[in-house]
Amino acid sequence: MDAKPQQNPEPPASPLPPEGATAVSPPPPPMRTTLRRAAFGAVAAAVLVAGALVAVPDEEEPAATPAPGPVARAEAAAAAGSPASLSDLTALIGDRQKWVETHPSDAPAWAVLGTAYTEWGSRAADAAYFTRAEKALQRSLAAQPGERGNTQAWAALGALANARHDYVAAKKWGETVRARQPKSWTAYPVLIDAYNGLGDYGAAAKATETFGSLRGGVAALGRTSDMYRGQGWREDALATAQEAADHARTPAEKADALHRLGELAWERGEPAEALAQYEGALRTDRGHLVSLAGRARALAALDRTDEALADYLTVTAKLPDPRYVLELGELYEASGLDGDARTQYGKLRELLGTAKAAGVDESLTEARFEADHGDPEAAVELMEKEWAELRRSAEVADALGWALHRAGRTEEGVQYAERALESGVRNASYAYHLGVIESALGQDGPARGRLEEALRTNPDFSPLAAPLAEEALESLGEPDPGGPAEVR
């Protein structure tokens, strides 16, 4: 049975125990297992950086099959190129902690531990683990510098930077590893995430293609589907995502693939299909909380509000991701429960403060919240800083354009709202924002087209904004008899 993300792999009495503390206490391993684990550290350090436990094939079979157990399953998942379950990831953390306690100069083991901390922190929305990850990776590099071959730790630092949304630093680490090992695939997941975060979609596409040629398998199929989605190639994204699901070999891998199918169905405006995919992911891995959040979103679109609220409350209690807290607050607000909405918005501010203190950049979610529920000028300041620091993704462009409009600077905002859609991504919220901005500028024809696009793409894209999109479209009236307006 998989552990849920809220399960802390450290003793609860001490949020940040010494790195040598043993969270999960496996029985003392036999000598052959101990030696094999030492060798495994060198492999795992190179392959944990993709956000899941993955490994290149090994030409030599281990001398003996280890006894079944969570650490062995995590290692088997790595050998099979699959993500590990959270319970097995927890066990791996405990195992590596115990190992480095008696082998403090084992650089690969520290790199494995650091990357496992990053993975846990990302999947549990617990930024405290990013601090642990950084310390472990520093220990790895102190034992063996990157210039002396420890590129595994460099790549892991890139994955950590991505987890903190520091895409400039992630790009630096990924490109450094690629320059030293151009035929190794381990740098490419780091680079794909970094380039996407910076809005350099051409470089992200090239990195995705190279990753596919070097790595292949379900991980590459998933990345390729994500690339097609970002380009607006829905049919290709769906076909590739389905292929990934069909070839998934472990429950964790299958749940990730089904979640991707759910996200694609949601973006197509098919909440019933999205619900089916999210529930399939949850049947496969009941601790897959991102799919529980997806199910909540789909249930709300299907007017099953009480069930949606229950799911959101479960998710936000176990996975304190600011995005889901914002979604819950907006669902309360759309339901006329303003007091409950304010409670969630207060919780959101607390989470944003905690993330900032831990070095995690959550300014995108913060700007979205401030633009619609707080201080639009503060949202503008946040997004202008992102833009100035070269984080120019479609998400940032959309948020900046909308914040400028909400702050009364509509003429400045339109160029950013347009840029958000230039990547080709089909996003109802982006189209809605641009439509409202164009309407405010008196561009009724383009505005009508954008609002129709938003509602055609996903008529239930937001419990708050979708009804506003319908009202805005109705207020524009019918188009002129000359024909439909051209959508830029």
Spans of features found by a protein language model:
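N-terminal leader/linker segments that initiate helical-solenoid repeat arrays
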Residues: A3-P145, G149, P459-D460, P467, ...
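Residue-level recognition of tetratricopeptide repeat
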Residues: T115, E119-S122, A159, D193, ...
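Canonical tetratricopeptide repeat
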Residues: V112, A156, V190, R223-T224, ...
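Short coil turns that delineate tetratricopeptide repeat
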Residues: P104, P145-R148, P182, R215-G216, ...
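TPR alpha-solenoid repeat register
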Residues: A109, N150-A153, A187, A220-L221, ...
